[in-house]
A protein has these predicted regions:
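Alpha-helical scaffolding within the catalytic cores
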Residues: 11, 153-159, 203-210
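Pocket-lining segment of extracytoplasmic ligand-binding domains
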Residues: 143-158, 164-191
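Short hydrophobic/charged patches on amphipathic alpha-helices used for structural packing
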Residues: 13-17, 132, 157-158
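C-terminal lobe and pocket-closing loops
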Residues: 177-213
Length: 279
């Protein structure tokens, strides 16, 4: 069974008791709320076990441990172990090459979080966690990491202009159902390139964003927002690394990797668009 979003509502222990799940899996971002509200204690009392995983806050640190746990509880250890080996190999390759860069070879990057989700409004960004980790691991210098020590926060467009980033990234997804009037770049399994390109062009024409040198020179990438909450986060690292350092990663093919992962490790058919650059 699934439950209402515990980030936007209180978790109902009563509902859990009625449904009698064998296990409830929570994201680590809910841990403090679950403790403070007494939910964890109540679930323990009624004998419902809980598993905490993290693909969101410190994804590159905790994905391996989270996948190992999921492999155990779902009796899929061989599959989980194979995924972990592939995951570690791909990330290690990126890290080894990025380690050869001098500090001045790491371009500055501003990443706009959920760009356009609330219309023309700008800008939220990522700090040292989540996509901030992806950028730094991929050989970039995330501007938000200097502003926020955790997941991120809000900056005004004047700050973005003043930072004059070498590259401008933005995250997007198909939020059309839950966010009325969204202008976000639709990315994910049900999206198409033509629609995503049109939405991206509109966001790049916003006042303040359209004056950025990175935008004028098309050093721009839109990337799937939910990469930061999935074990496929290494694909985002690969795609960003290749975008920032095309010569260094000319033999890396993130598109082939994401298709291969779906075929080998999931029950999902690959489809859609997960990142793009402006035409």
């Amino acid at each position: 069974p699934t439950f209402d979003n515990p980030y936007t509502s209180d978790f109902s222990v009563e509902s859990a008791v009625v449904r009698q799940p064998d296990l409830i899996i929570f994201d680590i971002g809910l841990l403090s709320k679950l403790k403070d509200s007494g939910v964890l204690t109540q679930l323990e009392k009624v004998g419902i076990p809980v598993l905490i995983i993290d693909f969101r806050q410190q994804p590159l640190t905790n994905t391996v441990a989270s996948m190992a746990l999921l492999g155990k509880v779902f009796d899929e250890q061989p599959n989980a172990d194979a995924f972990i080996r592939f995951y570690q190999q791909r990330l290690e390759l990126v890290r080894q090459r990025v380690a050869t860069l001098k500090p001045e070879q790491r371009p500055s990057v501003f990443i706009e979080r959920s760009a356009g989700i609330k219309g023309e409004q700008c800008c939220n960004t990522f700090g040292k966690g989540s996509f901030g980790q992806f950028i730094d691991t991929a050989g970039g210098d995330n501007i938000g990491s200097k502003l926020f020590s955790d997941m991120g926060g809000e900056v005004n467009v004047e700050q973005v202009i003043a930072s004059n980033p070498d590259f401008y990234l933005l995250t997007g997804a198909d939020w059309s159902r839950g966010h009325r009037g969204t202008l976000a770049v639709p990315l994910g399994y049900t999206t198409d390139m033509a629609t995503s390109q049109k939405k991206l062009a509109h966001l790049l024409d916003r006042t303040g964003i359209n004056v950025l040198k990175a935008v004028k020179e098309k050093r721009v990438m839109a990337i799937y927002h939910q990469f930061y909450d999935t074990p496929l986060n290494f694909i985002a690292v690969e795609a960003i690394a290749k975008f920032l350092h095309p010569a260094l990663f000319k033999d890396i093919d993130p598109q082939a990797d994401i298709e291969s992962v779906h075929q080998k490790f999931t029950a999902l058919d690959y489809s859609g668009v997960f990142w793009l650059t402006p035409q």
